[in-house]
UniProtKB/Swiss-Prot annotation:
One of its GO terms (molecular function) is tRNA binding. Catalyzes the addition and repair of the essential 3'-terminal CCA sequence in tRNAs without using a nucleic acid template. Adds these three nucleotides in the order of C, C, and A to the tRNA nucleotide-73, using CTP and ATP as substrates and producing inorganic pyrophosphate. tRNA 3'-terminal CCA addition is required both for tRNA processing and repair. Also involved in tRNA surveillance by mediating tandem CCA addition to generate a CCACCA at the 3' terminus of unstable tRNAs. While stable tRNAs receive only 3'-terminal CCA, unstable tRNAs are marked with CCACCA and rapidly degraded. Residues 225-326 form the HD domain. This is Multifunctional CCA protein. One of its GO terms (biological process) is RNA repair. The gene is cca.
């Protein structure tokens, strides 16, 4: 019985990165051997055990065989005769198919170290095509490390998409990998790789439809709506924004794909036109509520947020109410963060100031100076409870108006 450190721990060690989780493979053992040594079985799908002291995962070396479409259609074989190389061969990418023995020696039968040095993501074997999740994983690793995907691997990924493997992906797995990819250092790279292999058209057709749609060059020197979306997403990542904010950045301009061709490159109403596509994506991916709500909010209101200097005080108040800013000020702030990414996610505009954010927050703070509790109590005391909302609005407008006048005159 021999144990080896495998997978991501070896990869990150060789890259000089912190090793977060350590996974082990056991060669020359079976379930009875593991149980006799005090290991605890985990689940029943795979022969995986928890170490009695470290609680790290130890898996019996195994081979896998495709039995049906999708990521779940596998059967496995694990016994004492399965070799380390056979176990490593079933893994997705060469950089993940390395092991380290107890003496620190690296076992690398498929050239993972070579590909790490070259910055290449390459599939280990044709079995890569048996699991459609690997399309998403390869794109995610490209986003994490900035690596390129080998041409033969991209070709295989395209074939998988053409064969309908991507159609078999369930929403939970797509969201799981997408969310991880959005939180990587270069999330733009993930979307680019998914588009290059054709998977974006299957998984996020609303985003894929943005590519090739022109915008006004005076607002968008990058011209292409899809390129702007990638730049906005990447700017959100560079700003260190959260997952809901990055997700909203990805979906904020879906309405531009709905613009009638005869009015291009203008996109009047794309904020409103984008709401339904955003909802469709949210439902299809089963996006978490916080992500879904922020994406819809940003899509619907980002143009109005940009144009705050042109708005009347009454419109300002209406926007604050419709966006639920009084009850959910933190979400309102995150929406404005995405608007910064939208403004700066344009060619040669990455340092463009965005005073609108500070002004919106100042307007909200000013409106909150109106004592709604006191106003409500006074109205009730006077038998005019039906005037409460109107009186609160008047008080808020009285606070907003002078501040907005100053900003518009600046």
């Amino acid at each position: 019985m021999q144990t080896y450190l495998v997978g991501g721990a070896v990869r990150d060690y060789l890259l000089g990165l912190p090793v977060k989780d350590r996974d082990w493979v056991v060669v020359g053992a079976d379930a009875q051997t593991m149980l006799a040594q005090g290991f605890q079985p985990v689940g029943k799908d795979f022969p995986v055990f928890l170490h009695p002291k470290t609680h790290e995962e130890y898996a019996l070396a195994r081979t896998e065989r495709k039995t049906a479409k999708g990521y779940a259609g596998f059967s496995f074989h694990a016994d004492k005769d399965v070799t380390l190389e056979q176990d490593l061969m079933r893994r997705d990418l060469t950089i993940n198919a390395m092991a380290q023995d107890a003496d620190g020696k690296i076992i690398d039968p498929f050239g993972g170290q070579r590909d790490l040095a070259a910055g290449i993501l390459r599939h280990v074997s044709p079995a890569f095509a048996e699991d459609p999740v690997r399309i998403l994983r390869a794109a995610r690793f490209a986003a994490r490390y900035g690596f390129e995907i080998a041409e033969e691997t991209i070709k295989l990924m395209r074939q998988m998409v053409e064969n309908g493997e991507a159609d078999a992906l369930v929403a939970e797995r797509v969201w799981q990998e997408l969310a991880k990819g959005l939180m990587e250092k270069n999330p733009r790279k993930m979307i680019e790789m998914l588009r290059e292999c054709g998977a974006l058209q299957v998984l996020l057709p609303e985003v894929d439809a943005l590519f090739g749609v022109p915008q006004r060059a005076d607002y968008h020197p990058e011209i292409d709506s899809g390129i702007h979306t990638l730049m906005t997403l990447q700017r959100a990542a560079d700003m260190g924004l959260s997952l809901p904010e990055r997700y909203a950045a990805l979906l904020h301009d879906l309405g531009k794909a709905k613009t009638p061709p005869d009015i291009l490159p203008r996109h009047h109403g794309h904020d409103i036109n984008g709401v339904e596509p955003v909802r469709e994506v949210n439902q299809r991916l089963r996006a978490p509520r916080q992500c879904a709500e922020l994406a819809e909010l940003v899509c619907r209101w980002h143009i109005i947020f940009h144009q705050v200097g042109q708005l009347k005080s009454q419109t300002i108040l209406n926007v604050l109410k419709k966006t639920d800013a009084f009850r959910r000020p933190e979400r309102f702030q995150t929406a404005l963060n995405v608007c910064i990414a939208d403004t700066q996610g344009r060619l040669n505009r990455e340092h463009t100031p965005y005073p609108q954010r500070a002004h919106w927050l100042a307007l909200l703070e000013a409106a909150n100076q109106a004592d709604s509790g006191k106003i409500a109590a006074e109205c009730r005391a006077q038998g005019k409870a039906h005037f409460i909302a109107e009186q609160i609005d008047r008080a808020r407008l009285a606070q907003i108006a002078p501040l907005q006048k100053t900003f518009r005159g600046a």
